[in-house]
Amino acid sequence: ELTYTLPRYQVGCGVVDIMMHTLERYFNPGHPSNRMTDEIAEGLLRTVIDAGRVAMQDSHNYDAMSEIMWAGSLSHNNLTGLGGVKDFSVHQFGHELSGMFDAAHGATLSVMWPQWARYVVDTDPARFAHYGEAVWRLTRKDGESDRDLALRAIDTTEEFFRSIDMPTTFTELGIGVLSEEQLRELAERCTFFHTRVVGKFCPLDYDGILAVYRMANK
């Protein structure tokens, strides 16, 4: 009941962040070492998606809000990543946006995850395809490749973010279209001024990070 007074926008931010704390573990090199971890992660994501839709329409729905709170605890305690390594590149992208523009954390993640996913999809299209089938219940079309199904899964995730009124571009985030200088500054900050790469699933250097920021710059 303590959640009932939350602004609708902050509920949406919470839904996205809970999803991201699991997705940033779900997509990692080699994947978790056992099926159980995947099953827990996929079940949590489906639950948050369903409860999120309800909560965004009725923030006083006790059942929906309790599901979100419970999922938040499980998503943040590393249960959904046991046996694997954390990627968390999208969180790094988001932190720099929040630092430069005072944007809400969850909102930066809904902008950056679809762009990151499209940029790295060829690292493991089968993993993204499985995500689409297991979480979004997508059915593979006749002759559809892993990559095509993977892109459909990414699009479906982005559509969900829009459906709960979360931003998916810089303009929707409220910061407008950025200059090339601003994009380069974001990439520099994200790499600690060219001293590190970001992520484990597909490690990204300055050029890769800049490319992902450019994809969101609309």
Task: Please place each PLM-identified region on the residue numbering.
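A glycine/threonine-rich phosphate-anchoring loop and its flanking beta-alpha core
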Residues: 1-33, 130
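Short runs of predominantly hydrophobic/aromatic residues within well-ordered alpha helices
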Residues: 12-16, 65, 109, 183, ...
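C-terminal charged capping/lid subdomain of soluble metabolic enzymes
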Residues: 139-218
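Glycine- and other small-residue-rich loops at beta-strand/loop junctions that grip anionic moieties
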Residues: 8, 37, 201
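Active-site segments that bind and position negatively charged phosphate/pyrophosphate groups
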Residues: 25-156
